[in-house]
């Protein structure tokens, strides 16, 4: 009996030791990669354009694509941009889609077809502008067959990606202006193109203007545009570095937050505009430029990266080619360098090089962002907090899944990437490099993509050395 008791005590001691050993081993495990509360996979809302490479490739668009001038004035030669040389220049910048140019199929069919041919050659998708189609907005009884009879002229080109519909449609209560683009008339044609013919249509909304007076009207405007046109992609053009805005970034973020929320409600993506220069000249006036030209590189990068952190699944640069009247000056006659990735005389401006660098980075991260769902944004630091005070998508806890805290002046976009945590970290400062520190709830295996270069680390804490305005992608493996 005594021997039996000793045997049971021995077995009990061994069992207790095994429990303690197992418990200690569990404490040392990666508490992130084996979490029971990891996210379920969600379907991304990104639009897939097969010619660009499908859903893994982010549309990087140019607004005002190649057009034909081909004449001389004041000792300058204004070239024909619809050539191999300029399409190669566009491709080298990382642009893969042209959504609008001054070339209209109704007036210049041979030039539109040349654009499409060069698009095929250089891997650049084209949205076609055709007044033969757009003029049908005034016909409420227009049929799919009538529209298809026009599209047959160019829709077989592999580079044909859709139709240009309208830029900044107007309403009777918001930005009526000349009344030439009143919203209601676009509903029928949009339905025929998008629903009946499955053609992607390009349309772009006004930004909020004079928000103090127009906030409710603008919200109504966005809702009505969506109900009327039923867009497959939501676009708007807010340029944060226009001098008259006086650096009020809270309105920039409010507008983007509204677009993000609206896109989420309608289960569509949003594409954001990035300003390639400034000092626009819609009124075709002669004036001298402010210098230095703006935005500078860190401001430009900040513009792109904050949009990506909020979940943008398309980037649009305006203008790609500088319109002739955007170069009008007073004392010097012309200024080819104050706006446009490419100036009127074919010169590469500073924003060409900024965009080229940024687009290389996007090409290294777009598979993740295009297959992710944005779950909100963490802000860290006083300036970022002040500027996003009107923003509804902020994660107030400052934590997300395995991420427990962020230190530094930063924005962190939080994403569900096929059930994994992805984070897009932005140095919020446009003036200074910073160390941004992220702390996790256990040892994590982290893929880092910075300056288009990939690296891998394991750790509970991560310190990122980030240039002003820079964005870095993290994926927790």
Report residues per predicted region.
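Glycan-processing catalytic domains of CAZymes
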Residues: 35-442, 450-477
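Short, conserved catalytic or interaction motifs in soluble domains
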Residues: 26
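N-terminal secretory targeting modules
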Residues: 13, 31-34
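Bacterial N-terminal signal peptides that target proteins for export
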Residues: 2-12
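C-terminal motif of bacterial Sec signal peptides marking the signal peptidase cleavage site
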Residues: 22-23
């Amino acid at each position: 009996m005594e021997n039996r008791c000793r045997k049971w005590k021995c077995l009990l001691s061994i069992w207790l030791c095994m429990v303690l050993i197992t418990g200690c081993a569990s404490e040392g495990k990666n508490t992130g990669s084996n979490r029971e509360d990891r996210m379920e996979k969600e379907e991304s809302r990104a639009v897939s354009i097969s010619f660009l490479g499908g859903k893994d490739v982010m549309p990087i668009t140019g607004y005002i694509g190649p057009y034909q001038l081909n004449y001389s004035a004041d000792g300058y030669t204004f070239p024909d941009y619809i050539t191999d040389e300029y399409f190669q220049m566009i491709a080298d910048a990382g642009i893969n889609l042209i959504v609008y140019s001054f070339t209209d199929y109704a007036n210049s069919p041979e030039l539109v077809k040349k654009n499409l041919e060069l698009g095929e050659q250089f891997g650049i998708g084209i949205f076609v502008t055709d007044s033969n189609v757009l003029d049908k907005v005034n016909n409420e009884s227009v049929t799919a067959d009538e529209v298809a009879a026009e599209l047959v002229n160019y829709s077989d080109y592999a580079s044909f990606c859709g139709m240009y519909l309208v830029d900044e449609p107007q309403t009777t209560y918001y930005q009526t202006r000349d009344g030439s683009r009143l919203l209601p008339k676009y509903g029928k044609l949009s339905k025929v193109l998008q629903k009946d013919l499955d053609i992607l249509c390009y349309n772009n909304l006004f930004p909020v203007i004079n928000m103090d007076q127009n906030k409710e009207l603008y919200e109504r405007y966005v809702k009505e545009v969506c109900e009327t046109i039923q867009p497959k992609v939501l676009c708007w053009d807010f340029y944060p570095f226009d001098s008259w805005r006086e650096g009020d970034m809270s309105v920039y973020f409010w507008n983007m937050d509204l677009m993000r929320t609206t896109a989420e409600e309608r289960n569509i993506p949003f594409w954001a505009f990035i300003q390639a220069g400034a000092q626009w000249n819609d009124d075709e006036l002669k004036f001298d430029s402010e210098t230095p030209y703006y935005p500078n590189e860190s401001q430009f990068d900040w513009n792109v990266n904050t949009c990506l952190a909020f979940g943008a699944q398309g980037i649009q640069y305006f203008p790609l080619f500088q319109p002739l009247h955007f170069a009008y000056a007073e004392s010097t006659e012309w200024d080819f360098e104050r706006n446009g990735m490419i100036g009127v005389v074919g010169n590469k401006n500073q924003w060409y090089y900024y965009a080229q660098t940024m687009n290389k980075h996007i090409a290294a991260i777009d598979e993740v962002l295009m297959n992710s769902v944005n779950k909100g944004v963490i802000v860290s630091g006083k300036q970022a907090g002040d500027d996003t005070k009107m923003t509804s998508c902020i994660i107030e806890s400052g934590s997300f899944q395995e991420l427990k805290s962020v230190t530094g002046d930063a924005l962190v976009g939080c994403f569900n990437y096929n059930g994994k945590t992805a984070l897009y970290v932005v140095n919020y400062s446009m003036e200074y490099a910073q160390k941004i520190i992220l702390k996790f709830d256990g040892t994590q295996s982290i893929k880092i993509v910075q300056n288009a270069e990939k690296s891998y680390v394991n750790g509970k804490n991560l310190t990122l050395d980030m240039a002003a305005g820079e964005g870095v992608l993290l994926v927790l493996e």
